[in-house]
Amino acid sequence: MKKIVSLSTLLVCCLCLAACNTSKSKKEAASETTTFQETTTAQETTTVAESTIEDTQVIGSDDYGYVKVPKSWIHFAEVEGGDDIQYCDGTDVNIVTLNTFKPEHLGVSESEYAALDAVQVSTSVYQTKQQSKDFSKVWGSKSKIGGYDAYVVNCIAKNGKYLVIWIFKSDDGKFRYVSLEGTPEVLKNMLPLIEQSWTNKKA
């Protein structure tokens, strides 16, 4: 099964960004933040309604966090490997992915990791998607997931598939990665389910 985005690809790009950002001045860092914020306010934002999905299951781990997905969705692993937690509806179209950016992924020390903020990581992901030939449109927005403020990278693939990536820092200091990809019809119900159900501990 093949999904649009590979977290390993994003991590390589974030590694370069993190290594660069740790040596930047505060002025340069502020400039990057402003750039992403201007992008988010200038672009459209998806309006999320209440999810109508009632029959759900909790997926995830203590390392990656937990979300609810439809009970009929199944776990799968990429043929090329990777450490994502992924569930799909039985097709290669509608997919939820969970992961966490760790210091070793970003190529930084624990102290450098603690000094990073979500906008730095999200800006790198945003730029990677913008430069990809797979997408016809990429824009940024802000939202809340599990009560946390998140930077959201929204993409429309050339085949019409949508990709939504939430990047945020949870209260345990970890940078979280959650993505949802699929058709507009599926995203309509899945978006609020993901945003309302994410938690870093299983209830």
Residue ranges and their predicted role:
Residues 1-4:
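Positively charged n-region of N-terminal signal peptides that target proteins for export
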Residues 6, 24-70:
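N-terminal, intrinsically disordered, polar/charged segments of Gram-positive cell-envelope systems
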Residues 16-19:
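C-terminal motif of bacterial Sec signal peptides marking the signal peptidase cleavage site
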Residues 52-58, 81-84, 144-154:
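Short, hydrophobic/aromatic-rich segments at coil-to-beta transitions
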Residues 62, 66-115:
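Secretory pathway targeting signatures of secreted, lumenal, and periplasmic proteins
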Residues 71-72, 90-93, 146-148, 168-175:
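Short, solvent-exposed coil/turn segments at beta-strand boundaries
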Residues 73, 174-203:
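Surface-exposed amphipathic alpha-helical segments
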Residues 122-168:
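Signature of long, low-cysteine stretches enriched in small and polar/charged residues
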